[in-house]
Every structure is written in structure tokens, then in C-alpha cells.
Amino acid sequence: MTLLVITEQTIHSLCLDHGETNQIIAEIKQLEKPELLFSYITDAEPLATGEVFVGPDICGNCITHTFRVPDYVAKPPPYDSKRVYYPYSYTCLGFDSHPYDYLLTLDTKSIFQAIRKITLTRKLSIATQSDLDLIILKKLTTQSNCQSRVSSIWRQCVAACLAFEPQIQNNNSTQSPNLNNLVKRMFATLLKPIGRLPFYERRRNFVWEEEVSCPTILPLLLYSIQNLVTQFCAGVINRMEMILAFQYYLDCGVTAYQDEKLRLQKLIRNWLREGLAKFSKIAMPNWTVSGVISCTTVKPIMITTHEAREIKSAREAREASVPTYLLQYINHAIHKAISPYQTHQYWQATRVFANDGTYFASVAALTLNKAVRPRIEETTVKYPNSRYLTMNKEHIAVSLPNETDTNFGLACQFVKQFIPRLVTRLKNTNFQEEFIAFLTSSSSGKDFEDAAIATMTRTIQRVAKKRIVAAGLESRSYLNQQFIADECLAAAKLVGRTQIGRRQRAIAGVNNTRSLLGFPPMLMLKALLDMTGTTSSGKQMGNYLDLLIPLGLSPYANVIFNSADVDAMDASVQASVQQIMWHFVVYIALQLERTDYFAFTSGDEVIYELVEGKDSVATSIHMSGLARSCLRAMHLLQPQNCVLNDDIVGELVTREPTFPSGQPFTTVHHTFTLSNAIMGGTLRVTNLTNQPSTLLNLTVQGDDTRTINYGPKGCIEKCIDDQSSFVSDWGFKVSNETSSHTSEYLQQRVSCGTFVGYPDRVSLFAAERPKEGKTMKEKMSEIWSLVTDLGCRSRDPQRLVRLMYAIGVACCCRLTIRTERLVAEEFIASEVGRACCAEILVPKVAARADRGVMLRYHYPISALWLEEGGQLPPLATKRRDGTWTCFPSYYFQRGDSNRYWYWDVSLTEEKWITTVEMRSDWDSNNAIELIDDEILEAYATRYALAALGLNKTRQMERLRLSEESTIFDVEQLASGLNAYRNLSKIAISHRASERLKNAGVELPDSVLYSRHTQSRIQDAILKAQMTEKEEIEMSLYFFKDKGYLRSLRELVKSKSGDLAMIHRCEWGERVTILESSIFNVVSTTPLSMEVYPGSIMSFILCYTGLKGAHSGQLAGLVGLLQGKYGGGKISELQFSIAKKIYLTKPYLLNEFIIACGLGGEAELALKNALHAFEMLRGVEFSTVHTPRQFFFGVDSGVTLGNHLDYPNGFPGTRIELAAHLLLAMNFLSSNAQSCTGRSIRVRVPRGMWSRCTNF
């Protein structure tokens, strides 16, 4: 039986004809049967031992590999009850010494047989080592293995098969035919020996067929194949790299898959500098400080002594451990690469070998010691002292030291120049209100006793652990110092965090009270570090401007980069190092007079000055409440033990105090410490030697640092040694990467003047937390975000469109909800229900009648590109006259561009000429007349819109926030927190909102300053997981509303911005990109893996120019047309409400501004935005702008002026010109794959924009 024929053709061609929509639904529905799904993904011959593969690598050079299938694939080793797998000490040491942290490769059947044999007579007990091994193995196999992001692992396998082209498209004689259908061959290799799907997913767990024999690591290997498809579609690897990677993954799985990958991953990818060292000189883009390329520069490569030593050490370590076939590939890459760009291609491929895209998940107790065990790496750091003591004999930094022979003194030498500005900035800060705003709806880690929340409704009880709710419950206790002390002295709870490419971490789940004391240093140090210029998140803009410093300095001779990473920084922070931060923070807090902070009030305090050789001298100082809280925190938050409540072995306490990694100040503490270590040490050496330092730039974020040194080679090498020793003096061990041409910072690399991203860090199919019930829009929005993150790191992002559609069709085009049987049957019998193949699922286990039934229906494929649905770039669809809409583009800008498809597919050229251009009265009200109902029906648009009508957020509000008792509880919780906010401002806001209410304008809580806290508590309530009862009640809102019975015109309604839909763009005759200032550079030199000569983005950049060069008077108007009002000072909801007030009751606008608590810049921004809105009469063409999608280029259209043709005459007004630019950008981004450098013709009815706007 041939499966998914039309679906495969559609995804591979990305074209959809009228009659294929219903066929795709029918084909996808076939995969509801597990045996058919198994048949589809294994429809190929398995890979065989001894099979020889020959083909081109990612750079086109021929390579060969003889495949070998390890024995465990068909015959996994059985569980042996006599063997100890995860030795447990049965003491406070826990799993102190054990060879493996992650899942071992064993036969699942033998594990479940052993468990069943024991549980026939008794329960498994952790008191017996063999029982404990079984409990751990079961959890790792069923729970830690489950990482599916979008749908079940099996449907994700279908998506991988759909996205991968089964046949080689070109007639390449060097490529062996056995590379055809490669993905299905990989799946067949793993699954055909089993003969069926060996497990299914339920509630974030795998439920295994206990009589089926298969390897425990099978799910991880399936995810790894899915990831290989992702990387293949992105152009990062070719088929031969897929074979090598799959071979490596299978080899890693012989004993312990994840442990082996961790052991080798750094060694496999440690060869980049060695690969680049073969080039004596490299042509690099010459970036200016504003982010513009002026020309290219040829830079001689300088290999320092440090770099040569590091390269030699890396090669020796690699050759001692890495499998031979991977070593051969790396040596092949070093030898065959003819340019730095090809070296980068090969290096990215080896990163994929090292990282399969899965998360390193395990039982937290197993990885605890490696995650948090304290260690002293280099030096024991002395505690900072002060000559002043409090009455409790605590050192207090009334003044800063001047000496340079202590770490504290060195730190102060660097930062004291910023202190006056810092104090001025902080003086008007309301620390209490800032802390309340800091609280989120994440878990606080605190379990409330039943008595403490017994008076609250069930709705509140379910979310009591959320930070904002927990703070409301204990808000009055924040005025009690004893309560704060008791809460802080309790051991912090550790929680495991899994990551891609890094071992499992343990994060301290810091409760609200600890956060309360840890918040002031975070706020103070964040403000300080902003001033020093050494701190950088590295990702503020999300585009190349974040990398401008290393990009700009790369072409210069005598510049050396040193990327340094502190090994295990959380575990290496000594208590004395923390005290240095606290001493500084206390000193700053002492300057902020009369700043109270919860239980800590300002007042006079007696302190004692230690005078050498004399008795201490008592004196009185004024101490702010903030300083008192910081003094208390110095001792309450450190030293601190943590406890892990493991659901297998119970409670484990860390043996020694460790750094509280979950504290608000964790990142700024590390940044502050490393900045001071390097800058303080540099200042000391400069002053002692009277010689200038070669340190040109320092950036630090957490445990990541990058120094850029400029000067003679010998001086630089000495300074780099000094910088490492400065960090060592603070007790840290540093790993350096020194180079004149490549550097890494925060997982972003600049190499040879280009951006080289890490595509292996993006996983589309695996997630830290398995999938939850999400709408299609939520799922596809997440996929879009990941794809654009991957695209800018990859060679061929256009191919990712096919992958997005494969994921959408296989994983997101169905919805399963719980509802009442009669309602479900009524929907199934409806026209929409029949079209969407709706059915009631038969449960595997009989359910109670009051639990309702599970209804499943399928979305038409058109739902994937509608604005209410997935918002993917629309497939190429056929119009009435046989012409097609544009081919879907990776650079497509979501939003109103999706709505434009209604007009694009409806308007033939003949209709445009005879109907559109012949009339001059078009506006946003009558634009809807131009859509073709019949053609939209042919693409099942009505069915798609009807099926997408289930709005979970709105219906959840009705369910949870309608009970009076819940509303009362929310008010009570908020009142406790509001007591710490600006009470006068709250009162003013409340009175203004009451006046608006009396005038007939009722505002939602989320825009009101006075009800900001209530709104955030409500958000926490809405985010709680749904109960079965809520699922049923929520579905009833949708089905009883009968929205699925509406007509197409009821579902596609007019919008105020529909005027912008009446346009047509096409390629012109003029070749315009030759005049671009960047053309000569991008046609010869790569800027990144995505931008290289001849790439799609290299053409687009010649149209848009670089972001650094973005300027022009029309930028503001184009922004207004895109719906960008207020410059980020006001929220979208605030502006939406303000528009209605402005148009209907403008005299109430000032009351609205007061009620929202807007002032200064925000008030001015709102009034300017409303004025612009009035001028535009609400016309806009709003699109989503993702920085990484246009990593280098301007994505607004404002720079396209020289590339436009105006067949209906040059625009007569500025707004009409801005509209032409915006519509041209929409065309360019939607048609990027057909871009050849020609001009863009924008066709708009003459004078339409001038008539419909006030500009």
C-alpha cells in the first residue's frame, strides 16, 4: 500500500492545486493506524554491515564509508540482576562514585520482565541495589527518554520522512544509489528488527510494549535521525555526513549513549583553528564602527605561541579518543578545504556529529555531584575585611579600601570611578516595587501547608506555588525579620535542568524570600555593569550588530582574541568571593539614605572602628533599610546547603555549601567578579610597570569572557598570561582559546570577519520539557522561532520551508479535545466535521462517563498559512487562470502577509486590469469584495477557519476568572503586595479608572497601573494546566457557539487595514543591484554561513542594505504603516484601547493616561501615535519582524527606494511612497528565491492611498 503520495508531492514541490486539499487530510488520517505509520517510516531496506557508501561531502569532495551496524541494534544486551549499574552508597554521599550518569543500553523486554517478576510478590524497594537499578532504568527509559517537542515521536518520524527528499535529484556519478531513501533506511535499521512500534506516548512518558525486545536508547536514536534531517534541510550536512553521524551515534550507544557523547563532543569539534592555520592570509569584510562594510581586507594569519600550543594539545587529545572514521573526516576536511568558508562548513558538520540535538536528561540524583560539588581550582581567596564592625561584630564597608594587594581592593580600584553615577541613578528607585514587578508566574519552589491555603478557592490552591501568588500569600510576613531569616536558613531545593550539548545541571530553586534578599544586589550590580562597558549579553539586538566589536577588529593586524570559559564557576565560587560582592553592595546601599526595604527600615546604627593598637571607637551612622537587608543577606544566603528531593532515593543534601545558582544575582555576581578580576589586575600591573596594557576590549557575561588585545605579539602573549592569572587569583580555572582570527562568546562565533553560528544548538524535534496541549498557532510559532534561529546559522535556510510544512502537516494538523459525547456527535455530523474527518477516539482503557469523550479532527493544509493558524509562507496555489501565487520563501514576513493570500489567489491579471485598476473608490471597507469565494472554498479556507476557532485563552478566562470567590481571593492577594508599591500612584490610577467607568469606558486590569498586580495573578491562574473538567467546559464554549457553521464571509471579515491588500508587485526590467554599495563585497566575500556569493541573502542585501546603514526620513512612516506605534513605550493593548477612546470620546484620553500610569516619554509616545493613527485612518500592513530572519539586512523596506518602479505614476505623498516601500518589502521577502537583481514594480490604483489617508 502506497502512503502519503499527494502529501509527499505537495511538500516536495511546495505547490498545491485546488483538488488536493481533501486528499491530504485523508492521507494523513491513515497514519492514525500504528501499523500503517510503521509501514510508512520503514518503507526501505535497512542499512547493512559492510555496505559501502560513496558520495560528495558538504563541500562536494568525494568520501567513502563502510557501514557497520552494532550488534545491540538487533540484539540488545539483557538486564543482569547480578550486575550493579548505578551503585548507591546508602549514606549521605548518595551516588558518590558511579561510572555512568545517563541511560545504559539494555534490552527493554528484560528490564520489564525483571520488574514484573519481582512485583508479583512484593514492591520494588530502593533498599536493595538491584531493585534501585531497575527503578532508575525504568524512569530513564520511560520518562527521561521522552523529549518530543511538537507531537508524538512517531509523527515526528513521519515529518522527518516527508521533509527529506527520498531520491537524489541530480545525476552525480560519484554518489552511490544506496544513499536514496536514506532517512527511511535509518528508521528501518532501528525498527525492522522489532517489527512494530515498540511504545507509545502518554502524559509525557513512553509506555513500552513489555514483550517487545529493543534497545533502551531507541527513542534517542530516533530523535537523532530527526535532527539529522533538520541539519540536512538547513544545508549544514549532506547525505554522506548523515551516514557518518548515524554511524557515530550507533557506536556511542554500545554501552552508554549519552555518557559517551559527552566524553567525546569537545574533542570532535576542537580542530577549527588547526583547519584555518593552513591559510597564510585571509580576505575579510572590513566593518566600520556603525556596522557598514567599506571594503574587504586581506589579513595575514598570525599564530601565537599560545595558539600553537593549544592546537597541538587539542590534536593529541582528539587522536587518542575519537573514532578512526571521524578522525579521517576531520583530516580530510583540513586537507580539502580551499577557503575559510569551506573550513567553516566542515567544522559545522563535525559539530553535528558531536551533538545529536537531544537533551542530556537523567535522574537528578545521579548527576548531582558533578553539577554542584564545590571545588577549589587554583587559589584560596581571603575574606574581605573592613576596619568597621557592627554591634553583631560583622564587617561593614563604610568606606572602600585603597590597597591593591587584596581582591576586594583590586575590585574597588576599578569600580569606584562609577560609584557617584551609580548612586545618582539608584536614588529614585523603589526597590520594593521593582521586586514585586520582578516576580513571575514560574514556580517559587515553596510548598504551602494545607492550613495556610485552606481558605482559598481550589483555583488559587492549584497555583499557590507560582511566585506572584506565593508572594501574595506571604506578603504580610515580609515585614517580619524572623520569618525572613527562617525561610532563608532552610535548605534550598535543587531542580535538574537539561540542555543540548551540556551535562545536566542542578539549579537552586530559590524561594521568594531568598529572592527578596537577593534582588537588591542584582539591581545595583546590573546598573553598575551597564556603566562599566565590560558586560554584554551578546544578544541584545539578535542580529550582527551584537557582534560588531569582534567583526570590526578582525581585519586588523596585531589583534589577538582570547575566548575564555570558567570551568564549573558556580561550584568554584568560594564564600570569600561572594563576600566581596556583598561588601561592595552594602557600601552602595549605605549611600542610598532613607531607603526602606520590607522588614528593614532606615535608622541610626552604632558601629565600631578598629584602630590599630587601640580600643575600638564607637560611632553612629545612618543606615538605610536597604543596607540592613544586604548585611542580613551576607550571612543568611551564605553559606548555603541545598537539598534534592529525588522521587527515587528521597532527600539528598549537598555535603558542602555551594553557590546558590538560582539567585537573582547569580549572573551579575559572576560578571562583576570576572570583570573586576581582569580589570582590577590590569590596572595594578599597568600602575606597577608604568607600561600600557594591550587589553583593547573586555566583555563578560556570567562565566563567559572575551578579551581582545592589540599590540606587539610578545606583549600580547604576556598580557593574556596575566589575564588568566588574574582570574586564577580569584579561585577559578580557565580554559582559553587564543586566536588572531576566530573567537567565541556566548555560543556565537566570529571567524575570519564573518559570523559562524552553531546550527547544532537548535533542535526542532526535541525539547527540555515534552510537548503540552498547544494550538496550531502556538506550535507553529515555536517552530518559526526555532527555524529563524537556525536559518541565520545555516547555508541554505530556504530548504527549511519544506521542513516546516512537513512538521505542520504531520504534527500540527490535528486537534484532540475532551468534550461531551452529544456535542461531539453533532460536530462530527456537520459539514465542517465531515471535511475535517472528525471522530470520537476509542480509549485504550475504559473511562468514566463523566470524563466525556476524546474528539479528534484534522485541519486542512491551508490552516498552516492562514493568519489565524500556522502563519507559514503560503504554498504556491493555482488561480482561476492557471497562474500560481509565489513559491513559499524562508524570508516571508508573517502577519498581514498571510491575509494578503486571500487577494493574491483571488486576483487574476485580467481581474486586476478590468476590475481593480478601472475603479478609483477602493478603501478598506470594500476591499473584501475582491476576494474569490469559490477559489477560497476550493482550498478549504472556510473549513480551516472554522476548525481554528477554538480560542483556549479567551475560554479559559471565562472558566477560571468568573467565580466571585476566586475574584475575592485575587483581590486579597493583590492588596498585600500593593502595600509595597507606590500607594499614591495606585490611588490616582484607581480614581481615574472609576471616572472612565462612570463615563462608559471599562478598562481591563492588564492596562491599569492600580490593578497591575491583580492582572499578573490572573495570568498565573490562566497558565495552570487544564483539568479534565475544564477541558470539557472549554470545548463547550466553542461547539455550542456554533462558530463552525458560519459562512466564509462571516469568517473572513473586513479589517481597517485591508486597503493595503489592494496591490500587486512583480519583477521589473531594470537591473538595480549593481549600484548597491555592498554589491562588490557580497559578490566576492562571505559575511556568514547564510550570506555568501550567489546566496539568496546576498541578493537581498543588495536591495535592503545593512542594518548599520539604516536611516532616512521615511523610516517613521513605514513603521506606522506596520503598526509600530509608541516606540515600545506603550503596549499593544494600551494603544488599541486608546484608539477607541480617541475616536469616540477624546475628552477622556487624559483620564486614560492617568489610569494606565503613563507619564513622560510614554505619554508623549501615545499621543504621537494617536496623531499618526488619525492621519493614517487606521490603515496598516503589520508583519512580524524576527531579527535573526534578516540577520544583516534592513527588513522594513525603507531602503528600497532606488529599486522600485511605479507603473501608475510616482507617489504623490510621503505616505503613499512609504506604502510602496512597505509593499515592495513584502514582495521581496515573499519572492526571495526568485530574486535576480531586477527592480520591483509596485502596482496600486492611482491616488488610492492619498484619498484614504490624511497625509
UniProtKB/Swiss-Prot annotation:
Q: Which GO terms describe its molecular function?
A: hydrolase activity; RNA binding; RNA-directed RNA polymerase activity
Its Enzyme Commission number?
Answer: 2.7.7.48
Give the location in the cell. Virion
- Give the reactions, separated by semicolons, that this protein catalyses: RNA(n) + a ribonucleoside 5'-triphosphate = RNA(n+1) + diphosphate
Q: What class of enzyme is it?
A: transferase
Keywords from the UniProt entry: Hydrolase, Nucleotidyltransferase, RNA-directed RNA polymerase, Transferase, Viral RNA replication, Virion
GO CC, any one term: virion component
Question: By its UniProt entry, which Gene3D superfamilies does this protein fall under?
Answer: RNA-directed RNA polymerase lambda-3 (3.90.1850.10)
Principal place of residence: virion
PROSITE patterns for this protein: RDRP_DSRNA_REO (PS50523)
Which GO biological-process labels does this protein carry?
A: viral genome replication
- Segments forming domain RdRp catalytic: 548-756
Function field:
RNA-directed RNA polymerase that is involved in transcription and genome replication. Following infection, it catalyzes the synthesis of fully conservative plus strands. After core assembly, which consists in recruitment of one capped plus-strand for each genomic segments and polymerase complexes, the polymerase switches mode and catalyzes the synthesis of complementary minus-strands.
Name under which the protein is recorded: RNA-directed RNA polymerase
**Source species of the chain:** Rice ragged stunt virus (isolate Thailand) (RRSV)
